[in-house]
């Protein structure tokens, strides 16, 4: 896991300081590292590697950011990352992945809303509402998965947290947009 963190840092330095890669190439390299780490986590059954991969995946757009990126690209990438996380969490039954993804996704959305969003554009508001709707349904998928499982007693607190928080955030975004 630590070697991959160093690799993320190496790509960031190569992009920002030495301009060895273009922004697109650096981002593609980081996506490749994230996918490779996810595959290794499945092959070696290493939950902690999947967590590092997920966190690295969420940090990748910011590692190669020049401050002028598209919110559409960012939230599309986050949506794809969340769907991949959901597939991995179902396949390996790693319930903490959706929780980590949930926190990072809404944190990224919240930071974007605080620092980059202006309500003057109805097009941007429409896009953001579509993404919050997509995120809402993505984070309902693990809930349905848990409900289908046998051992719900151990997961009930996390389930209640996700349901309440997800509904509250979606309600808030509906009022905002």
Would you name each region that the model predicts?
Residues 1-177:
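Alpha-helical multi-pass membrane segments and their bilayer interfacial helix-loop junctions
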């Amino acid at each position: 896991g630590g070697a991959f963190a160093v690799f993320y840092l190496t790509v960031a330095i190569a992009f920002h300081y030495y301009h060895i890669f273009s922004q697109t190439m650096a981002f593609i390299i980081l996506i490749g590292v994230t996918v490779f780490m996810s595959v290794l986590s499945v092959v070696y059954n290493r939950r902690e590697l999947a967590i590092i991969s997920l966190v690295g995946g969420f940090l990748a757009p910011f590692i190669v950011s020049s401050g002028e990126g598209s919110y559409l690209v960012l939230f599309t990438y986050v949506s794809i990352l969340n769907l991949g996380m959901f597939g991995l969490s179902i396949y390996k039954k790693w319930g903490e992945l959706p929780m980590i993804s949930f926190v990072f996704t809404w944190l990224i959305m919240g930071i974007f809303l605080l620092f980059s969003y202006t309500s003057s554009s109805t097009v941007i508001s429409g896009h953001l509402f579509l993404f919050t709707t997509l995120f809402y349904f993505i984070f309902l998928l693990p809930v349905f998965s848990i409900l289908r499982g046998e051992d719900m007693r151990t997961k009930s607190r996390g389930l209640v947290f996700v349901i309440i928080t997800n509904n509250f955030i979606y309600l808030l975004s509906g009022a905002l947009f």
